[in-house]
């Protein structure tokens, strides 16, 4: 199984504003993310990301995607097809397919990296700096070496970096 962390970030590493606003993320980035998720067929998100994502009109693009929400407490999903797990490892056990995309929040992203469960990372850098916001990784005690596999321009002012996590 290949586990891919896929996130859009500001130049200074934020994945959302402090109020969870992600309206600054471009359509081109969304299209790239959506294609990656649909190709993998599996998506793992945190409960806050799930609540944000399911309110987006574009969420209908994921109707055929197996989705797992990682939540520490009991959590109610919108459909029976969306599963709930209480840890990154439990989420992966529910999705034993070839490829899985993880798209946090910062706490979930950090947990997956800390537990050494990520194989590849796609980072789409948006041309914006946010003074306050939610970081790509919440505070955890880890260090991982990466190998750059590819970089490409996904829009006039946006680039995508693709890394392999060295294990």
PLM regions and their residue ranges:
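Enzymes that bind and transform nitrogen-containing heteroaromatic metabolites
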Residues: 1-167
């Amino acid at each position: 199984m290949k586990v891919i962390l896929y996130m859009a970030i500001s130049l200074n590493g934020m994945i959302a504003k402090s109020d969870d606003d992600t309206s600054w993320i471009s359509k081109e980035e969304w299209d790239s993310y959506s294609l990656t998720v649909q190709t993998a067929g599996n998506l793992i998100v945190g409960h806050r990301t799930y609540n944000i994502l399911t309110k987006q009109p574009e969420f209908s693009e994921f109707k055929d995607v197996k989705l797992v929400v990682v939540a520490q407490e009991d959590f109610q999903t919108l459909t029976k097809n969306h599963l709930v797990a209480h840890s990154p490892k439990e989420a992966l056990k529910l999705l034993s397919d070839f490829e899985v995309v993880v798209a946090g929040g910062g706490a979930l992203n950090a947990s997956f990296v800390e537990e050494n469960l990520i194989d590849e990372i796609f980072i789409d850098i948006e041309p914006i700096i946010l003074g306050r916001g939610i970081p790509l990784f919440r505070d955890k005690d880890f260090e991982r070496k990466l190998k750059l596999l590819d970089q490409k321009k996904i829009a006039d002012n946006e680039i995508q970096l693709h890394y392999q996590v060295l294990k």
